[in-house]
Amino acid sequence: MIIESIKLVNFRSHDEFLLHCKKKTSLIVGENGSGKTSVLEAIYEALRGKSFRATDEEILRRGSEFYRVELKFINGLSTVVLFDGQKKQFLVEDKRTARLPKKYRYPVVLFLPDDLHLVATSPIKRRAYFDRVIAEFDEAYSSSLAKYEKTLKQRNDLLKKYAKNNDRCSGVDLNGDGINNYRRVDVGASDFFSWNILLAKYGLEIRDKRQKYLDKLNTVFNQVYYSIAENNDQVFLKLDLFGGEISEAEYFNRLESEFSRDVILGHTGFGIHRDDFVFLFNEKEADGTASRGELRSMILAMKFIEADLIFQETGKKPVVLLDDVFSELDNTRQKCLVRNFKDNQVIITSVEEV
């Protein structure tokens, strides 16, 4: 799917904007704050069905009653996104829908400057990033993740209800000092049985798919990193398993055994929602050991591999959106970046011509 043009009306700072795209690489040049990233955001929304950073109300240009995004493709098809201030609709092949149908969603590889902070950011943001990446080409992963998150929320809501409706629980030595300050209340543990089964099931499905993705990435990570950085540093991405490697039965038993503690805390303390993705640089954690340039090369290498894996899994060559990616890259590495994405349509933003 090749984009021919993108037109925006009342989208963020743009009252009207029109970009005619090239089949391979298009460059959007402008000062910081001129709305370049908003163009990538609009393209992403038309291809994926939602923004990567904001709600529709935040996207709507101040003082406007609606926003509109129109993406045209060289095959004659188009996708229109229309938000009237209250609800969003998609217009595809003369059909209006509240959500972009799956068959019209197209894979995207997205680079944002904030991605450089992946190494040092919080585990929750790293999980969110990789969950989005894996879901780009694995619908089963997306489904398991949605079910896990729904079940986790239901379990946490129930924990809070028990904590509110019953005396404070104890009998659990949270501080490791051997002191229990409150009367123990064993209440409702059986009500959590089904939630625990589902969390163990979906949790290990997610963990397995996360590990398989990293296995594929790590197979070529060093090779692709070398093509950018041109040095022999060793890079690796590891899945740090919260609670270690366990079976589904062990996962379930852990949830059962920590029921009283979870009631006190008001949330589920154990699970794959506590796993982390750790970047290694020469067998040490990259945070604090790799330079900013080395981190940028690691992230870009991941993007190249992501695009290739999406193509392998879906047969579709993703559209590549790169925001301010040339910053801090010399001419040689800029050319290398474009060369690595030679088989994809690439749209790049920059503060200057390159």
Indicate residue ranges for each PLM-predicted region.
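Conserved NTPase motor "head" modules and their coupling/switch loops across ABC/AAA+ ATPases, GTPases
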Residues: 1-31, 168-319, 328, 332, ...
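Hydrophobic "anchor" residues on beta-strands that sit immediately upstream
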Residues: 27, 89, 108, 319-320
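Conserved lysine of the Walker
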Residues: 36
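Nucleotide-state sensing region of NTPase/ATPase domains
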Residues: 45-125, 129-141, 218, 222-226, ...
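A conserved P-loop NTPase coupling/switch region
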Residues: 101-105, 112-178, 182-201
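Walker B catalytic acidic pair
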Residues: 323-325
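Conserved helicase ATPase motor motifs in RecA-like P-loop NTPase domains
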Residues: 348-350
